[in-house]
Structure formats: C-alpha cells, structure tokens
Amino acid sequence: MMSILQESHQIIRQTYKGVMKILLVIVICILPTIIFATNSFYTSALNGFNDENFEKAIKYLEKDIVFNPKSSESYILLGKSYEGIDDQNNALKYYEIAFTLIPHNLELNYLIGKVSYELGLIEQYAEQISNLEILCETSCEEIVKLKDLAE
C-alpha cells in the first residue's frame, strides 16, 4: 500500500515539475512581448501627439494604461491629448488620475488648475494655486502662469 502512495506521489511531483517548466518557458517568451507592446503603445501615442494627431494619441494611450495603470506620464499625455481636441472634461479626468500618482508634480498641478479655470471650477482652481504655493518654495513659473489666467 505504501509503495502505491509513494509511486503516486512521485508521479505527481514529476508532472508538477513538467508543468512548471512549461509555464516558465511561456512566461519568459511572452513577457518581453508584453513589455515591447507597452513601450510601443506609448511611443506611438507620443508620435501621434507630436504630430497633433490627438485621436491617434488617445487610442494608443488608452491601450498603454491597460498595461501600465500606474504610468503618470501616460495619464498626463492623455489629458493633454484631450485638451488638443477641446475635451476639457476628459482632460481633467485624466489629470486627476495622474495627480493621485504624483501629487507633487508642478506641471500637473498647473494643468489641473488651468483646466479647472477653463471649466469654471474656481474652487479647484484656487486649490491648485494653494498646492503650488506649498510646492514652490519661491515663485515658480507654474504658479505665475496659473495666476495670470484670472487676470
């Protein structure tokens, strides 16, 4: 009886080792493809943005954030692309997502403040000025540009 259990255990171990080797090979083969694809999405989006083809940039950035949900650069570029097609609401949405990832970014605080001002969200605009006053030890370009919007 004991030998049957030992044989079964040995067969299971060998099968498990074989399956794990196959899975390891699959992961090693697929992972570089996924990494290349995500870099390719962002690069294609950046090219589209630089060519002022904002719809193309949006298409690729939406794919990129599926693979890189913590890429603040992708969310910021997505916001700028939506601004490029005059969709301030979506621009603000993506800037706010990026803000959850990097709240200390001066440019991002400026962009949120600018779009908030354009949408008439004066409280949010004032909040971004306050954020920039905290982040900028002395006067910085972002706070000057943001305050100039109201003049």
Tell me what each language-model feature is.
Residues 64, 97-98, 131-132:
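Canonical positions in the second alpha-helix
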Residues 50-51, 84, 118, 149:
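Register position in tetratricopeptide repeats
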